[in-house]
């Protein structure tokens, strides 16, 4: 059966890095139908909207979406609803993407590029699972008003609402436990249950779900301690599951442990396994068109696409092994280049991965 992939390169370095990931997917000779469409600023320029109906329709009808990056300074003056970044939010809503998976893997060859000492991060291989659709980012009511009470009653105040429904917590908890079950059977749930009612509710539900996974070791950690432990002893973790706000912060922190955000893929999944796959980095308009962007995060995102949405784990393993081989050969794009290694361009890195696949 042919499986359809929506290819959305986007802005900045997006087209350059997605091109290399597409080359890798095509080299596998799988029955894939790759259809490309505009998104973000590129879509606004062409259709006056960052997520045109045709692009959204393609994404909905596909088994998975391979996404590049969106955003450019030239769009900063647009009304918020027309800015490129709204495209990714719109896709998350329309596809019901609620689980964000962010691996943080330190390849041995890049240990010296990490922010931490090699002996602390050597062998790091963790995954952070972030809930995407709830929490303070989407809770209502929110806004600016005259404070109705408190010490500063009558002054202007900004306010947001942190909230989670039971079903939202249950489904992300299941993703966490299922992921842990396939790895080392350790799951750490991160919250702020000592202060927030929402977090205590989160913890209670996670504990209930844990009864269905007696083979998985569950632990809990307050988010402030988790942020510290990721720097102090990151290898104590295997799978972390947490809410939208905490996950947003912790996943970026974990990214810096690996040496370069240009190496980190991500997946966002819905209940049926349909997913959006993208590198964790942004559109980097300052280096767009120079041929120096690192395509490995996007290529690894394509591997996640094969693993989680197309049920092709063996092909995903092939891509990941090819990336490891290329790094072992000493090939580096500018962001991870250091003395004693060979600097290559975006397309040359793609060529090397293709050769390693053969």
Curated annotation (Swiss-Prot):
Signal sequence bounds: none
PROSITE patterns hit by this protein: IDH_IMDH (PS00470)
Keyword Calcium: no
Location(s), subcellular: Cytoplasm
GO biological process terms held by the UniProt record: L-leucine biosynthetic process
Pathway: Amino-acid biosynthesis; L-leucine biosynthesis; L-leucine from 3-methyl-2-oxobutanoate: step 3/4
Cofactor note: Binds 1 Mg(2+) or Mn(2+) ion per subunit.
Record InterPro entries: IsoCit/isopropylmalate_DH_CS, IsoPropMal-DH-like_dom, Isopropylmalate_DH
Cited SUPFAM superfamilies: Isocitrate/Isopropylmalate dehydrogenase-like (SSF53659)
Gene Ontology CC terms: cytosol
Assigned EC number: 1.1.1.85
Keyword check for Chaperone: no
Record site: Important for catalysis: 137, 192
Primary location class: cytoplasm
UniProt keyword terms in alphabetical order: Amino-acid biosynthesis, Branched-chain amino acid biosynthesis, Cytoplasm, Leucine biosynthesis, Magnesium, Manganese, Metal-binding, NAD, Oxidoreductase
Catalysed reaction equations from the record: (2R,3S)-3-isopropylmalate + NAD(+) = 4-methyl-2-oxopentanoate + CO2 + NADH
NCBIfam families linked to this entry: leuB
Family, similarity comment: Belongs to the isocitrate and isopropylmalate dehydrogenases family. LeuB type 1 subfamily.
Listed name of the protein: 3-isopropylmalate dehydrogenase
Organism: Bordetella avium (strain 197N)
Lineage: Bacteria, Pseudomonadati, Pseudomonadota, Betaproteobacteria, Burkholderiales
Encoding gene, per UniProt annotation: leuB
């Amino acid at each position: 059966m042919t499986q359809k992939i929506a290819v959305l390169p986007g802005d900045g370095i997006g087209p350059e890095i997605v091109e290399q990931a597409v080359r890798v997917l095509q080299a596998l000779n799988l029955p894939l139908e790759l259809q490309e469409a505009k998104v973000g600023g590129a879509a606004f320029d062409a259709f006056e909207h960052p997520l045109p109906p045709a692009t959204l329709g393609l994404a909905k009808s596909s088994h998975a979406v391979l996404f590049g990056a969106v955003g450019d300074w030239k769009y900063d003056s647009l009304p918020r609803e027309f800015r490129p970044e709204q495209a990714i939010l719109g896709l998350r809503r329309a596809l019901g993407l609620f689980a964000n998976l962010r691996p943080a893997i330190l390849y041995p060859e890049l240990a010296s590029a990490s922010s931490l000492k090699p002996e602390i991060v050597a062998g790091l291989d963790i995954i952070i699972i972030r809930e995407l659709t709830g929490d303070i980012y989407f809770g209502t009511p929110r806004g600016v008003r005259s404070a109705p009470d408190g010490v500063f009653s009558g002054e202007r105040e900004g306010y947001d609402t942190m909230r989670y429904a039971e079903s939202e917590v249950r489904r992300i908890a299941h993703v966490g436990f299922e992921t842990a079950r396939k790895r080392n059977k350790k799951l750490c749930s991160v919250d702020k249950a000592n202060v927030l009612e929402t977090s205590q509710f989160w913890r209670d539900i996670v504990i209930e779900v844990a009864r269905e996974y007696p083979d998985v070791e569950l632990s809990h950690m307050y988010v402030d301690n988790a942020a510290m432990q990721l720097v102090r002893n990151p290898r104590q973790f295997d799978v972390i599951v947490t809410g939208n706000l905490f996950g947003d912060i912790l996943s970026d922190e974990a990214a810096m442990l690996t040496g370069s955000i240009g190496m980190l893929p991500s997946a966002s999944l819905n209940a049926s396994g349909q997913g959006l796959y993208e590198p964790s980095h942004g559109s980097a308009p300052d280096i767009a068109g120079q041929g120096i962007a690192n395509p490995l995060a996007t290529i690894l995102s394509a591997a996640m696409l094969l693993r989680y949405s197309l049920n092709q784990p063996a092909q995903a393993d092939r891509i990941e092994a090819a990336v490891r081989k290329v790094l072992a050969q000493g090939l580096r794009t500018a962001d991870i280049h250091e003395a004693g290694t060979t600097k290559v361009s975006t397309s040359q890195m793609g060529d090397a991965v293709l050769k390693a696949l053969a």
